[in-house]
A protein has these predicted regions:
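The serine-hydrolase catalytic nucleophile loop
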Residues: 107-119, 267
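Hydrophobic/aromatic-rich alpha-helical bundle segments in the mid-to-C-terminal region
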Residues: 2-37
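Catalytic nucleophile-loop/oxyanion-hole region of alpha/beta-hydrolase
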Residues: 136-163
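The conserved beta1-alpha1 loop
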Residues: 102-106, 257
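The alpha/beta-hydrolase serine catalytic core
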Residues: 67-80, 188-271, 275-314
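Gly/Ala-rich beta-loop-alpha elbow adjacent to hydrolase catalytic centers
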Residues: 173-181
Length: 314
């Protein structure tokens, strides 16, 4: 049926990426997808964003494949190497420089996304450094979990090591990666921040998800962890940590936000933008995950303009 025909299309597209781009993903996600496919079409699906939480979205899958193709092309044009920073898998892209961008991916992301950003940053004299967050990329089975009290200290230690090498450090971060970055770097010298669909009020987001799930604070406090139908697990300890660890962000920051973002309300991002030195760009047709050709075109122009220090005109 259509589902299985499209699954074959997905796998054939992945195989084409491997063949035509000198096997750029052989040591990470694509090999995992192909291996799982031999066991179960459905199991293979879970590693592609279009299958998030078991929902089949053909257009999203194809958009993800196109995005990976663009990343492969960008990687081919940029000098890059794999390394480890504080024993965390990392990449460094670009020629040697005294200024750097630290790239922090979001949930379901991976350090290799930085190649796409690097095609704009490296020509401006930056090196781009990216790490895998816990449970992502080359750390899928890490003992560390994607929790703020684990991820933020890792980012902070990465910054501290980079500060010994670079005289200027900026940060580009996506979604929850932006929140982790603000927690980690709020007291550090950051020359510039670029945030893509940032989570800026985690407490509000968790409370919103509790409303979606019909869960009260009393229930969550009693049960500690409650799985939801939309794929997230509500966690009382997480919410309590968030409330005990507020952050203050006052760095020069450029934000791009989708008008249809279902993770951060418009009033929340606007309030955050007014509270600090932030330039906010809104793509009205954009979503939390920028992935359609139209959305990517806007994101590309925004990246290029802001890396160059220009004012982006939407």
């Amino acid at each position: 049926d259509c589902y299985f025909r499209d699954m074959w299309l997905v796998v054939n597209s992945l195989a084409t990426l491997i063949v035509t781009d000198s096997n750029p993903y052989a040591d990470w996600q694509i090999n995992a997808i192909l291996t799982e496919f031999s066991l179960s079409l459905c199991m293979a699906a879970k590693n592609i964003k279009g299958f998030a939480n078991g929902n089949y979205d053909r257009d999203a899958i194809l958009s993800e494949l196109v995005a990976r193709k663009h990343m492969a092309n960008a990687k081919a044009e940029i000098k890059a190497k794999r390394t480890k920073i504080n024993d965390i898998p990392a990449i460094i892209a670009g020629e040697p420089s005294d200024k750097a961008f630290l790239y922090i991916h979001g949930k379901m992301g991976y350090k290799e996304e930085a190649y796409y950003f690097a095609q704009y940053a490296c020509p401006q004299g930056y090196q781009v450094i990216a790490i895998d967050l816990p449970e992502h990329g080359d750390r899928k089975n890490s003992k560390e979990k994607l929790l703020p009290w684990m991820a933020a200290p890792e980012i902070k230690r990465t910054y501290e090591l980079l500060s010994e090498r670079y005289s200027s450090i900026s940060v580009c971060a996506v979604s929850i990666g932006a929140w982790f970055s603000m927690l980690a770097l709020q007291d550090k010298k950051i020359d510039k921040a670029m945030f893509i669909s940032p989570i800026v009020d985690m407490e509000k987001l968790i409370c919103t998800m509790m409303e979606w799930a019909g869960v009260t604070e009393e229930e969550l406090a009693e049960r500690i962890k409650i799985p939801t139908d939309f794929g997230e697990t509500l966690n009382w300890n997480y919410l309590s940590w968030v409330r005990k660890n507020p952050y203050k962000w006052d760095k020069p920051t450029d934000i791009i936000y989708g008008g249809k973002d279902n993770m951060t309300p418009r009033e929340t991002i606007e309030k955050f933008s007014k509270s600090c030195a932030t330039t906010l760009t809104v793509m009205e047709k954009g979503e939390h995950w920028f992935h359609t050709p139209e959305q990517m075109k806007v994101l590309n122009r925004w990246m290029k303009a802001n890396v160059q220090g220009c004012i982006y005109d939407n």
